[in-house]
Amino acid sequence: MSAYWIAVASAQHVRRGRNDGFMQVNHGKAAPLRRVKPGDGIVYYSPTTILGEKDGLQAFTAIGTVRYGKESPYQGEMGGGFTPFRRDVEWAVAEEAPIKPLLDRLDFTAGKSNWGYHLRFGLFEITDHDFRLIAEAMGAPKTLAEATA
């Protein structure tokens, strides 16, 4: 049985990971990534386009499935001695989708005035329903949600 996760990062950082086929969370920490397993569904939420800016992007910016082959997170090279922990991801072809139209339908936000609370953790588990709803909003292939079920 697969799990589903939302990771949080600026869109600029997400795009780099999407282009290179990996994910990293919480400034490269290993512990959160140990909860994520091959076959799990991943969605990235980006509050901003660029880290530190307040442009109000608030959108889902990538969706995919953790690749099989490496059972544990590994360290990647970013330069300057920074070696963050990562997991490889098969990113789906999808469009960015704003979160606001989904707030009343997502299990983790529905009926909550402080809907951004969970997003502060950087990585948290979501329901199958939420993953499918986000995938649909992003125009991701239907096989993505089916492949992780």
UniProtKB/Swiss-Prot annotation:
Transmembrane segments: none annotated. It comes from the Bacteria. It holds the Pfam family EVE. InterPro entries: EVE_domain (IPR002740), PUA-like_sf (IPR015947), UPF0310 (IPR022996). Belongs to the UPF0310 family. This is UPF0310 protein msl3206.
